[in-house]
Amino acid sequence: EVIHFLLSNCKFWLEEYKFDGFRFDLTKGFTQNKSNESTASNKDDSRIVILKDYYKTVNTTNPNAVMILEHFCNLDEESELAKAGMKLWHNMNESYCQSGMGESSNSDFSYMRNSGMPAEGWVNFMESHDEERVAYKQTAFGNLQNAGLDIRMKQLGTNAAFFLTVPGPKMIWQFGELGYDYSIMYKYDGTMGTEKNTDAKPVKWDYLTDQYRKGLYDTYSTLLKLRNDNPDLFSDNAFKDWKVSVSNWDKGRYLRLESTTKKLVVVGNFKNEQINTGVYFGNTGDWYELNGETLNVTNSSEQPVVIPANSFKLYTNFPVNN
């Protein structure tokens, strides 16, 4: 009866209120099998059947509706659910907090992708209602504690360049595009608690009036427009290579996408000093930066490029209309 009640409500909301879809909380609990904290993430075939039934109802009612699961189970189960059409939350908070703070340890981005998971299966996120804000951690820990807002926002822009260019769905948590830096432990009365809480946090529309936060906002906007204008370049088949592990910190991180006719290269510097590096482009000729400047590539396998501190450069083999 409970399942029937929930499914009938989902159908009603989709038809009557035109919902775009649903995000179900802690779906590893959608089972009749007993488990504990250490076993709940193990593959549960009965849970897979239940969730597929839910998705069938949603998909039959509206084929375009999205069903997102906060699942956090083993890859074999998540992969099967993703192949059925569902999307699963994927937590990248630690990696992007570390890079956002200018700390190389535990900052590997490569966990965003897995050969056993469809590219559209994981909804990667840097922040959520359960996780600490990257911009807050910049002010409290790491190598940017004493940096100015201009530098911190540039670092967050470099984070975004290695987040939004990766094929697959992404979640941007509220005001992350403006560098929201109130802690998850901030309380409604204006004091700082000692634990995560869901108290209402200040709504900071005034961030848009700050030139550095607006600059971060514009970076997000530009990257998202690039994705929307060039879906072929951000499909899973277009993903060619990236070097985003801890060992790639000192010489700059790198990502390359390539569709039938379009190419994109991102190079990022998360350090507090300029780096000079050699970049693989794949072909010589003119490449275009997001700011409209042109780079004439003469060495396709190791073109010298200078990346300022806390910055990124994104190149395409076609002019980008911003």
Tell where the protein language model's regions lie, with residue ranges.
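Solvent-exposed beta-strand/loop surfaces of large extracellular or lumenal domains
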Residues: 289-302
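Active-site groove signature of glycoside hydrolases
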Residues: 7-37
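Active-site-proximal helices and loops of the catalytic beta/alpha 8
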Residues: 26-126, 161-165, 176-262, 270-285, ...
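C-terminal beta-strand-rich structural cap/linker in extracellular carbohydrate-active enzymes
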Residues: 299-322
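Extended catalytic-interface subdomain
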Residues: 129-131
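Short, acidic/polar
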Residues: 1-15, 156-160
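Aromatic-anchored helix/helix-loop segment that forms the rim or "lid"
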Residues: 137-160
